[in-house]
Amino acid sequence: MPRSRINGNFIDKTFSIVADILLRVIPTTSGEKEAFTYYRDGMSAQSEGNYAEALQNYYEAMRLEIDPYDRSYILYNIGLIHTSNGEHTKALEYYFRALERNPFLPQAFNNMAVICHYRGEQAIQQGDSEIAEAWFDQAAEYWKQAIALTPGNYIEARNWLKITRRFE
């Protein structure tokens, strides 16, 4: 039985029911349906903090999913898990891969900026202001891209860009 069928969360159950109805009425292949089931189960496991299970489901969804747009969200979610696990290099790789397939993911740009900013802060703590500035400059570029895609969002990032004189 798919994980999403046994999840006790009302929102997850509602999402699963709606998704099942849509899968019945929208013409899709069996592979697309199976990919979506794995993706949905991955999201369910991820929301509960079961990252290993979520990754297994996402990797299986990636194997089956052929649509680049849908693949971008799978890759993005894999990046989120690696970010949560502190595996920032891997996370950046998955965010890049997601953006290759869908350049309109402001949340991926934002998460990449957050990682770069964090690395800049680490460099300051280690006394390397030159490396810190390079990381901060990279964070600024990613935040600018996120803001360009969704101008009303990322207010804190916009303020940081203004305060640090990185916003044009």
From Swiss-Prot:
Xref: Pfam families: TPR_1
Q: Cross-referenced InterPro entries, in alphabetical order? A: PSI_Ycf3_assembly (IPR022818), TPR-like_helical_dom_sf (IPR011990), TPR_rpt (IPR019734), Ycf3/AcsC/BcsC/TPR_MFPF (IPR051685)
Q: Tell me where it mainly resides.
A: plastid
Provide the alphabetized UniProt keywords. Chloroplast, Membrane, Photosynthesis, Plastid, Repeat, Thylakoid, TPR repeat
Chain segments annotated as coiled-coil in the UniProt record: none
List, in alphabetical order, the GO biological process terms annotated in this UniProt record. Answer: photosystem I assembly
Subcellular localization, as worded in the UniProt entry: Plastid, Chloroplast thylakoid membrane
GO CC, alphabetical: chloroplast thylakoid membrane
Topology of this chain in the membrane: Peripheral membrane protein
Q: Where are the TPR repeats?
A: 35-68, 72-105, 120-153
- The question of whether Chloroplast is a record keyword is answered with yes
Family (UniProt): Belongs to the Ycf3 family.
Describe the function of this protein.
Answer: Essential for the assembly of the photosystem I (PSI) complex. May act as a chaperone-like factor to guide the assembly of the PSI subunits.
What is the protein's name according to its record? Photosystem I assembly protein Ycf3
Q: Which organism is it from?
A: Solanum lycopersicum (Tomato)
